[in-house]
Amino acid sequence: MAAKEVRFGDDARSKMLKGVNTLANAVKVTLGPKGRNVVLDKSFGAPTITKDGVSVAKEIELEDKFENMGAQMVKEVASKANDEAGDGTTTATVLAQAIVTEGLKSVAAGMNPMDLKRGIDKAVIAAVEELKALSTDCADSKSIAQVGTISANSDAEVGDIIAQAMEKVGKEGVITVEEGQALQNELDVVEGMQFDRGYLSPYFINNQENGTVELDNPFILLVDKKISNIRELLPTLEGVAKAGKPLMIIAEDVEGEALATLVVNNMRGIVKVAAVKAPGFGDRRKAMLQDIAILTGGTVISEEIGLELEKVQLEDLGTAKRVVINKDNTTVVDGNGDQEAIEGRCAQIKGQIEESSSDYDKEKLQERLAKLSGGVAVIKVGAATEVEMKEKKDRVEDALHATRAAVEEGVVPGGGVALVRAAAKLSELTGDNEDQTVGVKLALRAMEAPLRQISINSGAEASVVVNEVKNGDGNYGYNAGNDTYGDMLEMGILDPTKVTRSALQFASSIASLMITTEAMVAELPKDEAAPAMPDMGGMGGMGGMM
């Protein structure tokens, strides 16, 4: 085991604080509408330019191991805030730095670190309740666009496109962000349920111009097995032909004789038919077939529940207004399923999302939920260069997370005002003893830090701005974008409650642990031994010399 270096007390804490400040100072320049960019060097390719706090934090590793420990703990604050709410990483970092700095001053002055921690915790719990009381619902497109705009660093175009996407696919819908080909941002919306399986044979195509299969008001047969014997399908084909409607088959696979017969029937015009493979694999395939069944009002034909393909009746088939199939995707528009059954299935999937511990499973469940409840929107980010594209895509993703958080828990006045108002309401709060009260007060003082930093980044005098905002009440605050004061909600400067709340909780959690640190242990740096000099052989022709 390698030898370790141990540092104690103020020596340890001062090293840790230096690391905290190095990381936080690099991150906090990005805060607010007039925040600056940070350029990150990459080992290959062009450098990345970003205003995303967590992206900056993740790049920072310090040479001194004790300083690095402080930096890594603040990095954890930014990462946690990003995981929880998808935004607010810079705010969380600024809060953590403020609490640690104030806290370590109090420890140096002889306060008990554990009592300080209890005081900080008490203040934060009370402040979170105040934030919830300040919160208002974020339901209409205008406020969603405003939240997106603020989170994308005052880019109104991004806010508007996210609001449009949410309007099209609903609050639960899946919205994905991709790199586009154009210079402008574009929004693509897929109505209905789409899954990534195309037609099994190009002979099913009936729209030659687009290379797609288009079926109007089709019956939909859902089968949880491979179909290779046409005899099993004959009763269904006859029933559908009599009804004079097209048929779409979704099965594990359709092959051999069965597929050939379907193609021949289709080409002769006896029955308009198309077949696709069921989406997903294993248990997920069964679940997705069941989703399609509920959406279209059909039944999954599965031998597991005693249903045989030969005995299928027309009432077992699902129906939809329209189905469009290309070589890669199938889209079912306006399934005729029972609305109550669809809502019940959505509620069931939401329950599974909450219980799931796997990010991958959560993502897949979220996709299924979106497909059932509205559709999928794709925001294609446009930019002139690859460097700009990366920076813009980061901002759009941040804004998307922020708007989801806003819809979930509501919004509070932005620009650091909510934290100042919450702190003002708690000015009478005290701890169980003097040291705890100091902890309470330092946490409330630290809650002014985001507003101070926004002011500094916009070139204003921080103390003047903070006093002006404190003298006001309600939503009155400072708009750093145009250097004016007024009602933050009316000016459209909103922050999601969830983002502000989680930034404060994670910052105080890690910062109060750092305040209570008394010793730090790190490996001693290894001395790199200089390589031995190579043996110098005798010079040629010197053999006879004595």
Swiss-Prot record:
KW Chaperone (keyword) present: yes
- Which residues of this UniProt protein bind ATP? T30, L31, G32, P33, K51, D87, G88, T89, T90, T91, G415, D495
Spell out the reaction equation it catalyses: ATP + H2O + a folded polypeptide = ADP + phosphate + an unfolded polypeptide
- PROSITE patterns hit by this protein: CHAPERONINS_CPN60
Q: Where in the cell is it found?
A: Cytoplasm
This protein's superkingdom?
Bacteria
> In which broad location class does this protein mainly occur, judging by the first location in its UniProt entry?
cytoplasm
Q: Which GO terms describe its cellular component?
A: cytoplasm
Keyword annotations for this protein?
A: ATP-binding, Chaperone, Cytoplasm, Isomerase, Nucleotide-binding
For molecular function, the Gene Ontology terms on record are: ATP binding; ATP-dependent protein folding chaperone; isomerase activity; unfolded protein binding
Q: State the oligomer form and interacting partners.
A: Forms a cylinder of 14 subunits composed of two heptameric rings stacked back-to-back. Interacts with the co-chaperonin GroES.
NCBIfam families the record matches: GroEL, PRK00013.1, PRK12849.1, PRK12850.1, PRK12851.1
Q: Write down what this protein is called.
A: Chaperonin GroEL
